[in-house]
């Protein structure tokens, strides 16, 4: 294991070692990039979580960069926690247990649907929080396996429960209603977005994180571009 960490550091001399915070929770980073993306295409972004509870809600259009941002944060956080250098200009983190819901899958063998598997994952997170465990949570488009009304109601309830349990983390979503939670919890929730811009009938992405709730959606535009009548 030590040889692997040493080899990783040797192969990435431009990476830096993070500073370790001693108070739950803190993660502040500048110019974080995904280690698996080529340098010439890697767009870097910042993160700032200074206290508990605190959640970043990331909204945005399809392909705008939400999931890549979550993976960038998660990979660098894990690298920093195990003693490896990170792809960033600077990073300070508190080494809590990281829990994610990024690639939940169903199971025919266990007779378990995608939705039920996701519920089990979310229940595990709530249980650990209620037991007093310190977690850093990363969620990507939760409750995809149900209808939009049920999904919105469940997502809002989950976010309120996470805040009540002093949780910290990031959630990416297409549901703009979640962004309204910042008004209810201005000291615990912050909105950020990735935008898709349409110029001259072409879709462009900056992949740069911006403050606020997403303004542009692109699903219908992409359907039309693919020749599907909308």
Task: List each language-model region with its residue ranges.
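ATPase nucleotide-binding head domains, primarily ABC-like/P-loop NTPase cores
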Residues: 13, 18-230
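Transmembrane helical bundles of ABC transporter permease domains
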Residues: 3-13
């Amino acid at each position: 294991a030590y040889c692997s960490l040493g080899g990783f550091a040797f192969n990435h001399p431009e990476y830096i070692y993070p500073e370790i915070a001693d108070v739950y929770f803190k993660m502040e980073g500048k110019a974080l990039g995904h280690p698996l993306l080529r340098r010439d295409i890697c767009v870097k972004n910042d993160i700032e979580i200074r206290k508990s509870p605190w959640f970043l809600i990331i909204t945005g259009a399809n392909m705008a960069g939400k999931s890549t941002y979550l993976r960038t944060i998660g990979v660098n956080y894990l690298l920093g926690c195990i003693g490896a250098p990170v792809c960033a200009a600077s990073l300070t983190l508190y080494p809590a247990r990281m829990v994610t819901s990024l690639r939940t899958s169903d199971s025919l063998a266990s007779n378990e649907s995608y939705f039920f598997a996701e519920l089990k994952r979310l229940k595990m997170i709530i249980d650990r929080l209620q037991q007093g465990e310190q977690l850093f949570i990363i969620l990507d488009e939760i409750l995809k396996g149900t209808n939009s009304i049920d999904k919105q109601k469940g997502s809002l309830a989950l976010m309120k429960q996470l805040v009540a349990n002093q949780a910290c983390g990031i959630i990416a979503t297409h549901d703009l209603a979640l962004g309204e939670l910042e008004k209810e919890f201005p000291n615990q929730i912050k909105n950020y977005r990735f935008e898709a811009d349409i110029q001259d009938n072409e879709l462009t992405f900056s992949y740069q994180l911006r403050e606020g709730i997403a303004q542009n959606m692109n699903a219908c535009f992409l359907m039309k571009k693919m020749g599907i009548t909308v």
